[in-house]
Amino acid sequence: MSDTILTAENLKFRYDAEQPVYALDGVSVQVKRGEFVAVLGANGCGKSTLAKHFNAILLPESGKVYVEGMDTADEEKLYDIRQTVGMVFQNPDNQIVATVVEEDVAFALENLGVPPEEMRRRVDDSMKMAGIYEYRERAPHNLSGGQKQRVAIAGVVAMRPDCLILDEATAMLDPRGREQVMQTIHYLNRNMGITVVSITHYMEEAAQADRVLVMSKGHVVMEGTPKEVFSQTEKVRSLHLDVPQAAELRDELVKAGIGMPAF
């Protein structure tokens, strides 16, 4: 089995074939199995478009995308690709379909015809992993935003994906909700070995990743560990992004004449 789970090779994509502007313009990236990758960029940079290619929601205009070696353009592999890569979107209300939490988590498994005993085990395990087991008999609409998002995550995890794509999954949450969701995601990555690709605007979330990709105008323009990327504070700011508070504080101390190690 290859160490690489996701690959994009010279990926190009336009939403309107009659327009010259590409949402993705020659993007080549790889994500290793078990890795936590954060993707940053200003609005319109192409990061969500890239995320949707990894789940075959969108298909390349040119170039290739592979999921565990499967070509996303191969219709016969579509089911396997979406079993391998689960997605969690910005608004949890768009992913919740049932009126009881545990029924929502079980929804996709029921559609797949998973045997009842296995379904019960998967649903319970997924709710416990996501930290929502105590809410299993509650109505989703009575939960907080962070709790709803963890219900959505549990529903995806119940499918046993190898990779989880978060498309700005914390964008609509308050700080407490973001913290709850990220604790769940880190648990799934570190303890369950699930590969995570997180599309985010939050620098503090990106600082906790194994690797950071920064996109601008359809290109990957920076790549490296959080330390390597965020130590280039001026370049990050030139891309209309903030830097983590730790890097910002270091810059201020250096300006004040206090010697500091790199971020």
Language-model-derived ranges and their functions:
Residues 40-42:
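The feature captures the beta-strand-to-loop junction immediately N-terminal to the Walker
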Residues 55:
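Helix-to-loop junction immediately C-terminal to a conserved catalytic motif
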Residues 117-135:
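Conserved ABC ATPase "signature" region
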